[in-house]
Amino acid sequence: MKSLILIAALLAGTYVWFNNGNHLSAPSGTEQQSFAGPSSFGQADSNRQVQSEGVVVKVLPDDNHGSRHQKFLLELSSGQTILIAHNIDLASRISPITEGDVVAFNGEYEWNEKGGVVHWTHRDPNGRHEAGWLKAGGRIYQ
């Protein structure tokens, strides 16, 4: 009898763990492109949730003004360079991250003349914005 209760408790705990998003996997049910995604983004994509991947070409210093952000530049397969601004007050930082690393991303794209920025690469604690994420080294950061 005690073993049945223990098994039921373990199953319930596992269910709660996975349904509260505490696991390290990509969100399910998203209608996004594959990690390869589009090879470039433009002004028409501004303010949209996008998903793709690129190679880290420069690791930048953290932005510690207001909400803290880990920042780095990714080069997409098209040659376009985009800035990733990953909120490390709401999500774990990618560590270590170095030039040449491949990083997949899901976040909100904002166009600018330099190629654009992707932010919202984390969950919204208030549940009002689509969750984003970064994937590097086989791990999801959100």
Where are these regions (language model features)?
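OB-fold and OB-like single-stranded nucleic-acid-recognition modules
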Residues: K2-Q142
